[in-house]
């Protein structure tokens, strides 16, 4: 083995030289230079600085404006809550640990941070799955004129929590475990060891199949069918400027969704799977740290892509920030008129991303 395994940690460095120390008790500056930990700390501070207000404003504006409390926006609200959850319960701990060069909260704190980070990330991921399914059902109409109601939204939110808990809770109960990863400043599921005492191998396989591969397949299938359906509708209505506009908007949104999904999650999952599949292989702490922090940045990408590009929400947010008046003149009446003007067989409410 090219690493050093302890009771609650795995350091990606052999202890032949005797320099390896517990990541819960000593700075890990033998893994990376102090300035690298400073960069990590600054990066986490930036994510908090951007992620907290964006997600907080999403929650606040939705509560303030009744017209935003639609069934579909329940899922978007759940997504913002999950991101906010990650920022408060995960990013702050990682930043504090990076300042000290090791996971200063101890093994118990590692389990708590690992649980909350995993829970928030999984809620966000499964919220994207529910959004993809909703868009597919409404636009592609596999079930005729299906209407996404409040009950469906509540069930969708409940589903995201059930799936997230089914991933985050098992390590707390003895199926796998949470340990410090990368530069030892944040915690996640143990991909590094087989650890037969906690059946680690079976849990990692379960996690990759159920909580990564399946969501990825669902998202690609739903948005792939969505693009095809909108293109077919546009081809049948060449004279409809509204349909052409809808096609471009949906295509753009789908490309952004897929690209940022891949940027956020595929590097992390790929590196984790490589480490798990090559037990004992030599790799540095940076190898796992970089993709892990790409995944963390999803807390910023998600609200920007799924909510900030929504015209109605954007107008409501501007109104809230400007003390009840939109300086750009976008009021409810003009929004309503626009909605009526844009009505067609493939309406903007059916094909818009939110």
Curated annotation (Swiss-Prot):
Glycosylation sites: 2, 15
Species in which this protein is naturally found: Bufo bufo
Keyword terms, alphabetized: Cell projection, Chromophore, Disulfide bond, G-protein coupled receptor, Glycoprotein, Lipoprotein, Membrane, Palmitate, Phosphoprotein, Photoreceptor protein, Receptor, Retinal protein, Sensory transduction, Transducer, Transmembrane, Transmembrane helix, Vision
Motif 'Ionic lock' involved in activated form stabilization: chain residues: 134-136
Major place of residence: membrane
Residue spans, topological domain Extracellular: 1-36, 97-110, 174-202, 275-286
Taxon lineage: Eukaryota, Metazoa, Chordata, Craniata, Vertebrata
Protein name per Swiss-Prot or TrEMBL: Rhodopsin
Topology of this chain in the membrane: Multi-pass membrane protein
GO molecular function annotations of the record: 11-cis retinal binding; G protein-coupled photoreceptor activity
Gene3D superfamilies, per database record: Rhodopsin 7-helix transmembrane proteins (1.20.1070.10)
Region annotation (Disordered) ranges: 331-354
A GO CC term assigned to this protein in UniProt: plasma membrane
S-palmitoyl cysteine-type lipidated residues: 322-323
Positions marked as site (Plays an important role in the conformation switch to the active conformation): 113
Cytoplasmic side, ranges: 62-73, 134-152, 225-252, 309-354
Record function comment: Photoreceptor required for image-forming vision at low light intensity. Required for photoreceptor cell viability after birth. Light-induced isomerization of 11-cis to all-trans retinal triggers a conformational change that activates signaling via G-proteins. Subsequent receptor phosphorylation mediates displacement of the bound G-protein alpha subunit by arrestin and terminates signaling.
Positions of post-translational N6-(retinylidene)lysine modification: 296
């Amino acid at each position: 083995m090219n690493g050093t395994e302890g009771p609650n940690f795995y350091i990606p460095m052999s202890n032949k030289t005797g320099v390896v120390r517990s990541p819960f008790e000593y700075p890990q500056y033998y893994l990376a230079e102090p300035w690298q930990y400073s960069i990590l700390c600054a990066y986490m501070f930036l994510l908090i600085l951007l992620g907290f207000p964006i997600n907080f404003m999403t929650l606040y504006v939705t509560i303030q404006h009744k017209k935003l409390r639609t069934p579909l926006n329940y899922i978007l609200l759940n997504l913002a809550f999950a991101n906010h959850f990650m920022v408060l319960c995960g990013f702050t701990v990682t930043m504090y640990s990076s300042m000290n060069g090791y996971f200063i909260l101890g093994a118990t704190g590692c389990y708590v941070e690992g649980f909350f980070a995993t829970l928030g990330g999984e809620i966000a991921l499964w919220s994207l799955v529910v959004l993809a399914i909703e868009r597919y059902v409404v636009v592609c109409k596999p079930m005729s004129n299906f209407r996404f109601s409040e009950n469906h939204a509540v069930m969708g939110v409940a589903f995201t929590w059930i799936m997230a808990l089914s991933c985050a809770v098992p390590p707390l109960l003895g199926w796998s475990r949470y340990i410090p990863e990368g530069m030892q400043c944040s915690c996640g599921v143990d991909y590094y060891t087989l650890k037969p005492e906690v059946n680690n191998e079976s849990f990692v396989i379960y996690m990759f199949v159920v909580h990564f591969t399946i969501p990825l397949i669902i998202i690609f299938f739903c948005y792939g069918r969505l693009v095809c359906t909108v293109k077919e509708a546009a081809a049948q209505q060449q004279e409809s400027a509204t349909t052409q506009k809808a096609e471009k908007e949906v295509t753009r949104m789908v490309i952004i969704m897929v690209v940022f999904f891949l940027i956020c999650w595929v590097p992390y999952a790929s590196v984790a799977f490589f480490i798990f599949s090559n037990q004992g292989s030599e790799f540095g702490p940076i190898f796992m740290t970089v993709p892990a922090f790409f995944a963390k940045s999803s807390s910023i990408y998600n609200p920007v892509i799924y909510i900030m590009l929504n015209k109605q929400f954007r107008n409501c947010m501007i109104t809230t920030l400007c003390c009840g008046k939109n300086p750009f003149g976008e009021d409810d009446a003009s929004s309503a008129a626009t909605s009526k003007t844009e009505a067609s067989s493939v309406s903007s409410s059916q094909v818009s991303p939110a």
